[in-house]
């Protein structure tokens, strides 16, 4: 078949196979060069991919809900998630797909398995069943941009694959960096699986229109994977900052008493007891602080809790408590003299604990048992709100904590530094950055590298 052009000159017959490449080239060029409508005049349709979403209580579920609320102020959001699996009381009957609508937000749950997360094999089955059902469903969901988070740990690869099939831009919001986390946390052994996973992950990073990370330390990790620096953006989780004139929330004396007990000085780790922490350094250091009236209290749960409880059975100044309800967070934060944030060596930039921002907003000092390359250590020392014991030195940790516990003036200075730093990481400002990234990605056309 032949086609004809007419441009005022004598007509010329051109083979069709020569037209098609030209058209495709023009389409590619127009995706980046054509004038666009103002970004904020039209709603954007966002497809968010994450296995967990409330009522699940994982960190990614809570953050996904926060991001969705910010997006839904102006945009239409579809959340493609799995069945709840955290709380047995929230389990739901199996259906292939279940849909809920709330304003501009549609929550579409695929019929993934909901095994308890305590056994790794069953957790992996939850992951795979979610991917098996979510990918084909995503192909038929209208959207302008895909936002992929990191549950399951290979969700970024799933997002890149879906974006490729749908010919849509995609933003990769990395909460924990995999497979680095799995290998560094001894969940996956170095070998063929890790190498294939890493290769696919690097492909997903290159395909992303933007890669959103939680800190400068994580950004450095991503850049080391040969990703274009222009596309890697830091958006911190931040914390809600109460107005200066707002009254302080009432504190629950029972919560405070449960945490403090009879200790003179309380170091508190509140959060997940996962594979990333320098837990043995904490326990060994705490044992040498028993005669100083210093208590180490863990509030929370996680894969390492049973091992830690067993290891601490003979350490009298170490205590484990379950999570408190969400409305008691201010009391939990207030109960401590200083808060622990820990990352073991080798995982700097792989995991970025977002609890730092809530601690800052509460005006509490931080003991960052982490490599100095970590944001919590480097920022904390620069701004004066943290001390940073070596994560491999229990004696050094104990010495710094002992000195801090005997120096009320230093504690006050660090607490004041925390309050001064907190507004720099105000959550609504960070969320606006993420919304802006998604708006721009949606109007830029698909990424074609």
Name each model feature, range by range.
Residues 258-277, 283-286, 297:
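Conserved donor-binding/catalytic core segment of Leloir-type glycosyltransferases
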């Amino acid at each position: 078949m032949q086609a004809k052009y007419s441009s005022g000159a004598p007509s010329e017959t051109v083979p069709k196979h020569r037209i098609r490449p030209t058209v495709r080239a023009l389409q590619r060029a127009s995706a980046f060069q054509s004038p666009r409508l103002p970004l904020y005049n039209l709603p954007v349709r966002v497809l968010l991919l994450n296995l967990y979403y409330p009522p699940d209580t994982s960190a990614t579920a809570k953050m996904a809900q926060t991001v969705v609320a910010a997006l839904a102020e102006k945009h239409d959001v579809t959340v493609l998630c799995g069945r709840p699996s955290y709380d047995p009381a929230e389990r739901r009957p199996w259906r292939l797909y279940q849909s809920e609508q709330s304003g501009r937000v549609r929550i579409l749950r695929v019929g993934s398995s909901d095994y308890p997360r305590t056994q790794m094999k069953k957790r992996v089955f939850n992951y795979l069943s979610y991917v098996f059902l979510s990918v084909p469903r995503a192909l038929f969901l209208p959207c302008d941009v895909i936002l992929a988070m990191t549950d399951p740990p290979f969700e970024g690869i799933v997002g890149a694959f879906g974006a490729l099939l749908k010919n849509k831009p995609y933003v990769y919001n990395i909460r924990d960096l995999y497979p680095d986390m799995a290998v560094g946390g001894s969940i996956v052994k170095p070998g063929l699986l890790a190498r294939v996973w890493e290769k696919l992950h690097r492909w997903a990073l290159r395909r992303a229109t933007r890669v959103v990370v939680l800190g400068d330390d994580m950004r450095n990790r991503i850049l080391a994977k040969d990703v274009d620096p222009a596309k890697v953006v830091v958006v911190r989780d931040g914390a809600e900052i109460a107005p200066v004139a707002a009254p302080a929330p009432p504190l629950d004396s029972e919560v405070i008493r449960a945490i403090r007990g009879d200790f003179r000085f309380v170091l508190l780790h509140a959060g997940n007891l996962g594979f990333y922490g320098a837990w043995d350094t904490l326990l060994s250091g705490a044992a040498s602080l028993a005669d100083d009236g210093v208590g180490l209290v863990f509030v929370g749960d996680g894969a390492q809790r049973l091992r830690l409880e067993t290891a601490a059975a003979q350490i009298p100044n170490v205590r484990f408590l379950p999570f408190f309800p969400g409305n008691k967070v201010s009391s939990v934060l207030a109960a401590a003299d200083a808060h622990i944030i820990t990352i073991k060596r080798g995982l700097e930039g792989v995991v970025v604990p977002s609890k730092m921002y809530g601690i800052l907003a509460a005006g509490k000092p931080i003991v960052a048992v982490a490599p100095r390359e970590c944001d919590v250590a480097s920022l904390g020392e620069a701004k004066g709100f943290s001390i940073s014991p070596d994560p491999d030195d229990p004696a050094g940790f104990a010495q710094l904590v002992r000195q801090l516990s005997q120096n009320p003036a230093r504690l006050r200075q660090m607490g004041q530094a925390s309050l001064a730093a907190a507004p720099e990481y105000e959550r609504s400002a960070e969320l606006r950055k993420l919304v802006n990234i998604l708006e721009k990605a949606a109007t830029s056309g698909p990424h074609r590298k």
